[in-house]
């Protein structure tokens, strides 16, 4: 039963069922009730009439239902479709009205009158009798002007056309296409096109097609296809005071291409594009007169629907060939029969090509170029279809699914992806011209193409390229790490060098052979495709980012002379590394016989910038992993390793010869960073010194002098447990020279293990530094923001010489000589004061000075400010207390004398390379010099202060030499590994190491007694009123702050990514803490700093194996 008749049922039954009953009642009752009966009867008649009108409207609406819906529409479907049409028209009307005269761009807009429009229309329509011009308003939608021949073309009256909306003339199924192509924002101005008409033969506007009818009854209307070109104009009329935006359309009627005037046979060509699912994506406008369909009729529908049922299976074979020759020039296949709009069939000779997505390697769409071979029987392709073609939707769906699954396979052809020689549908005509498809599409790929590469061949080629690239990468890494060593270090001679050279030469020859074979492979195969080049590029990027474990763990500065092939081997055991280290020391011991005379001549007093860059790059190599494997060395080996070597000749050679440009390297970046930091600090200091308060700040900095002592002895494990920031800015610990004559001169095992990996010092002709010349270490790395090369000297000999040593060192370094007393040091100019580094020894204090160019951390204040470079660890810890009470008192007296005369000495050290530490940090409450003197007595005990977290580094402090800043940074060492303050250890270290759970407050009180007198507030009190900032921070209540935070969290909660249940299960298999909804526990690593062995060398090796990711160079 048709639901269309549902509204008529109650209306039709009502008068028949209820009418007689009412009449019978009126006959039995009196005349007073007759009046009520007549009124109710009239109401029923009105109801019936309204019901009949409703049925007529619904039937009329069903006529406008889209023709694509082959099923009979119901009343509900018709009403919904009508509602959607109303909403669409209303939305477009609102959009046009919102533009108004101000919505469109008004630059260079020409306003036309109605007379001008008439002249324009007659000018462009007089050449073609099937063309007319129509202008409709964007605000009202009504026609403002229409040509005279429009009534003849549309077979309608002229008066009717002037009073109607232009959209009312369109077929309902074409309204959406009309609105999509006439949006004012995308229409070109008419005057702009006419000005460039001589340059362009075609109009810049994009044409579209619609069916338009004239007047008459709706049932007798006949829609004809028209080609429309829209333009934007502004019309001024008497009804509108302001110019009104309008659309000028040039409408041309389309005739069948097989009727007069016929399209030539050799020009009956059009192109189509469809998806792997056989759905039309694009249809050439040349197909409209040849097939009778408008582009919007075909787009979105299946191509199989329009093919003859017997030709549909051919599409499977066609798409199989499309997959086989994807990316190649077009190929031809069997002709197919295509159904036109009037129900007749035309035979098409088609050539097919495809576009391959270069990323997914799948066919994205298929391009068909079709040429009509035979015309349809009924040449009027726009005629109404008499009989409906029977189509089996089930068969079409099965074929579509089969073709879609076929084209889901990736393409492995070696040819370049894309259209091949076809280009695109627009550029296609440049290749194919107007000739037949068989003549223009080129030869078939079976004849001239190379044999297709199989998947196994592609994989073999990729693997071969990968092996070659990996070997080249290893060779480049070995060359980059060995070359600086050869220039800055004394190369060992012997069997090891020959073995390294032979292995390196073997690798070079092998790489050359592989490269040559790769070149032969490239000559044999055809030109590489985009996919092959992309694959090779991915392999190269993978190899570049890939870090070999051997390169990580065996990157030893200045001793890494092994070849890349040896680096690829696993890490040797502890015993083998010990033997290698001892053997290396024996070799170098034999070579430390030649005297050094370069210091006398002063060939190289300072290093060049290139040497700085190279050494800073070398110093970034990590020696922490090998130091963990190296066992304690014998005392004589340590003594030999610590003796100065003559390396000045190499340094002068580097400075004189210069360096070859190697591009952007770590050394170049380090030098650049050093330069930028130096410039920044210099500008900041200059700004402060030139301010009105420069003198006050300079004086204030001298009044706040503090002191501290330094101890070397941090292990590589300590630097590795530091966290992410410490890993980025690692630095090498200085080898601590030990006086072997002293009974307590025994190094910590981990500190001793560092020595083979450090840059060793050259031999000296005289055991005394006062002899032939002072030999400096090749690179003294200061724990500053960047590694720096700084001149230094053997501390063990300098400590025993006293005043003469200071004078000799000053002469050798090119600086004013140091006298025994502190007055000579205080007499240095401010430039030297800024770059002073204080080194405390057990016997006599020594204050080496560097030139200003080597300033690792220039002061942020005035000259002589207390903000100095980080103190260099220069002394190894003593495992046993060897100094007597008398020597302790002497150290204390010397320190007090120096601290009184040297107000610029400060213990506010900063951490390694961190740009954020350039900012001023407020110190913790510090104790005064008097309080330190009171606490530093002959009976003062030494304390080992452990941070809040046992997993972090521990610092052993000395009671008589501790300062207030040491208290601040020792407490902060638990949360950050950037602290570089070290303190000398004594016999109390073993006691504290056994009981590490002492309260932090108690340890702090014992280590730093009375450290609460001087604070930052005393400095603020002495600061003038005009210097202090005068703004006030507004008060914020606790409840208000919590409320705002809660609102922000709630607003951000919806933006947070959520895991799906499957992802949670997958993660839970690896991370068990996800089930409990808790944070993962942090791993704890304990580092040993005391001289007693907190963990054996084997434990260190286990930590290295468990945490390979932290062991980075």
From Swiss-Prot:
Q: Which Pfam families match?
A: bHLH_PER (PF23170), PAS_3 (PF08447), Per3-like_PAS-A (PF21353), Period_C (PF12114)
The record's section on Gene3D superfamilies has: PAS domain
Name used for this protein in its record: Period circadian protein homolog 3
Q: Give the PROSITE patterns listed for this entry.
A: PAS
Per UniProt, residues of the PAS domain are 120-187, 258-324
Q: What is the lineage of its organism?
A: Eukaryota, Metazoa, Chordata, Craniata, Vertebrata
Q: Which InterPro entries match?
A: PAS, PAS-like_dom_sf, PAS_fold_3, Per1-3_PAS-A, Period_circadian-like_C, Period_circadian_regulator
Query: Which residues carry the post-translational modification Phosphoserine, per the record?
Result: 907
